Structure formats: structure tokens, C-alpha cells
């Protein structure tokens, strides 16, 4: 009789592979903070709730063409003056529902709501505010292209006595965490709590976000420039000159999906620059500072990139109202600096 001996010391699956497969989002947050303090557990629980919202939204999107009341518009207009899509309403309600009974946050602020949503029974417990864009790129939903959700967490430091959220009118360096969820061929959550940028893939068989990549670093330079060139003649001369520059020089490629999260994710992984400048009619631009630009700037800076309004870092810009907008130039350091140089050169020439 022949016995086949196997070593108990050699696992059939590499240990590092198992470690990664076993690293869920909530576990990773606690590892990042190297603590089981109440604050660390709160942040871990908040990220878990955001992940739950992402799973619910992803499930809805995956069946969007098969269900009633998912595609198209509601017929209403939001605080931004934009037509509201049904998926915007659903995703906004999902975030409220998953946090309403959590005891983790005392209010949520969304670009879909005029004022913050308050959870009075949680205020003595919840020490945080969640700011979010429930569905970014919602015009893509009806044609089955990628969309996303953007989020940021801020600590409650002051009383909000008038219920207007004026204590949130501070620069982006007040954020303690930020990230996004991209709903594409797979659902991916990317986040930072100030200790690097990390990505997690939703494993449908487990129903869990599993670690995909740690400590993502954006290249210092990349080939992609991402902007809506349909606005070319509405831009000022500096941005038009930059666009002509990339047209004339080899090595650049244009990519624009209509979903901010999708374009930023590409640049995070491959390098390059995303621009949403102001226009002649709207010099403040289109993107909301608190719900879109500042959270993504926090993330990109953590990955070694740069984010600017063309003149100063986005994270240093202080909003004057809850739904303030700002131009955005974000991505690889060298590419953002190049755009800034065109803007600054024009300023010097014009002010002589």
C-alpha cells in the first residue's frame, strides 16, 4: 500500500491570496485605524452602511430595464434646477433608509435635497454627517452605461441650530473619509480614511465587498484627458489653449463617459487629467463642491494626485452655500499642473 504524504505546513492556497479574500471592507477600516476604539468602530460601521447602500443601488441598476419606475424622469425639478430622474430619487432614499436607524450619523446632506436630512433621535449618538451624490451620471442609466455614487464623512463639531447646515461650509480638509462606488461590469467601492486609497469589489456570491487593491497610487503623468469638448466655445481662452495644446502633441487620448465617477476611476488607475471648467455663462462650473469635487479631491490627493479649481487646491476652497459649485481640474500631478499653468499665464497676461 502506498501512502501519499502531504505537508501540513504548505497550504493549498497561497496565504496572501486567502488574506485578501478574507479582507472585507469593515475589517479593512479597523486595520487601517489600528484601533478598536469607539471612533474606529463607528467609521467601520458607517463604511459598512455605505456598502449596503451600494449593494441595493447595484441590484436595482442590474434590473433597471426589467422593472417599472426605474428609467426616465419623475417630472420634478431638484434644488439645482435639474430634472430629477427616478433612479436619483431611489438612490437618495436608499442612503437615508440605511442610515436612519443606524445611530451613526445625525444628518445626511445630498445634492438631491435642498437642506440636510436630520435624524433627531440619533443626534445624541451620531457624531457624523454623511454628504453624498446618490447617483452621479444618472443620464447614463437609461442607456445602460456606468454610473456611480460619491460620498464624504465629516465629524459633527458644532451645533446646527438653524437647520441650514451652515456649519458644513468649511474647506475639504475637514473631511475624515471619502470615496465612491462605481457601478459597471462589476461594482467597485474605492475609499480613503486618510491612510491611502483602497478598492473593493462586490462579490455577488458572497454579498461582500472584498479587497481588490491597497494603496493605489495615481501615476504622475498619464495619457488621458477627460472633458466635454462640446463646451469648447463656452470656455475661456486659457482652457481652449490647453485643449489645442493636447490636440497638437502626441501621447494624449480623449476619454469622456458622462459619469464623473467613471472618468475619475480611469484616471486614478491609468493617470491623466479630468477637467470640468467654468463657462462664460457659469464661471463657477457645474460640479458641487461638497458632494462631488471635495470628496474626489480628498481621494485623489491621498493617491498622490492633485485637485484644483485652476487657481488653488480644491480642498482649500470654502463653499459659501450648501450647494456651491466649483470648476474642477483633477488627476495626475504633472497634468493638473500643466492645466494650471495655462490658467495662470492667461491671468498674468490679462492683469499685466
Curated annotation (Swiss-Prot):
Cross-referenced InterPro entries: FBPase_C_dom, FBPase_class-1, FBPase_N, FBPtase, Fructose_bisphosphatase_AS
Any single GO BP term: gluconeogenesis
A Pfam family that the UniProt record links to this protein: FBPase_C
Pathway(s) per entry: Carbohydrate biosynthesis; Calvin cycle
EC number, as in UniProt: 3.1.3.11
Keywords linked to the UniProt accession: Calvin cycle, Carbohydrate metabolism, Cytoplasm, Hydrolase, Magnesium, Metal-binding
Enzymatic class: hydrolase
Record carries keyword Repressor: no
Subcellular location: Cytoplasm
Gene Ontology CC annotations of this record: cytosol
GO molecular function: fructose 1,6-bisphosphate 1-phosphatase activity; magnesium ion binding
Gene3D superfamilies, alphabetized: 3.40.190.80, Fructose-1,6-Bisphosphatase, subunit A, domain 1 (3.30.540.10)
Catalytic activity of the protein: beta-D-fructose 1,6-bisphosphate + H2O = beta-D-fructose 6-phosphate + phosphate
Residues annotated as binding Mg(2+) 1: 111, 133, 135
Main location per the UniProt record: cytoplasm
Cofactor: Mg(2+)
Keyword Hydrolase: yes
UniProt: substrate binding residues: 136-139, 228, 256, 286
Record note on cofactor: Binds 2 magnesium ions per subunit.
Positions annotated to bind Mg(2+) 2: 133, 136, 292
Family recorded in the similarity comment: Belongs to the FBPase class 1 family.
Subunit field text: Homotetramer.
Protein name according to UniProt: Fructose-1,6-bisphosphatase class 1
Organism: Crocosphaera subtropica (strain ATCC 51142 / BH68)
GN (gene name): fbp
